[in-house]
């Protein structure tokens, strides 16, 4: 069980995200992380650590941020380490994941992903597949990736060249989207 969130807006994104993750911490307190898209460079920076959201808050800087995603983790695949904490980043793709990808070992073998993975999680496999299929069209990459995944999941995804857009998809696992004006 994990807590995931995505946010884009005009508020102080970092504080909104970290405050929301503290509310979601009951869903997982083994590790926490956020990915933030810098307003000037559009580069996605990942901050993550084994431990609580309060530990994460201490390592995050306060640049102006366009959009972000965040995660609290209850470890299911892989130990409680900084490397296994979310978000996971592969190429232009950054994501957070809740659920279980049952066929992640087969996908690692089928797509020869072992050399590029940095964690022991099923989640990073989804990031690697998305990056594999990403050719400039996020929806097409998501569609192709999801067709390969078996299990229950919710994903919140950032693409580096889509500065103020957040994508989300789910299979069985719940996800809520809100638009505030």
What are these regions, as identified by a protein language model?
Residues 1-181:
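Conserved short alpha-helical segments that host acidic/polar catalytic motifs at enzyme active sites
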């Amino acid at each position: 069980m994990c807590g995931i969130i995505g946010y884009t807006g005009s508020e102080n994104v970092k504080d909104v995200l970290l405050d929301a993750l503290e509310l979601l911490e009951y869903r997982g307190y083994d590790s926490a992380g956020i990915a933030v898209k810098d307003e000037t460079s559009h580069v996605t920076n990942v901050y993550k650590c084994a431990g609580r959201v309060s530990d994460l808050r201490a390592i995050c800087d306060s640049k102006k941020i366009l959009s972000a995603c965040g995660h609290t983790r209850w470890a299911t695949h892989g130990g409680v380490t900084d490397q296994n904490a979310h978000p996971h980043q592969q190429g232009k793709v950054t994501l957070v994941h809740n659920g279980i990808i049952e066929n992640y070992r087969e996908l690692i073998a089928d797509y020869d992903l072992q050399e590029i993975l940095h964690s022991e999680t099923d989640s990073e496999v989804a990031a690697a597949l998305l990056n594999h299929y990403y050719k400039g069209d996020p929806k097409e990459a998501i569609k192709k990736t999801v067709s390969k995944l078996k299990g229950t999941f919710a994903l919140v995804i950032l693409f580096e060249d889509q500065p103020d857009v957040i994508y989300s998809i789910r299979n069985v696992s719940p996800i809520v989207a809100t638009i505030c004006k």
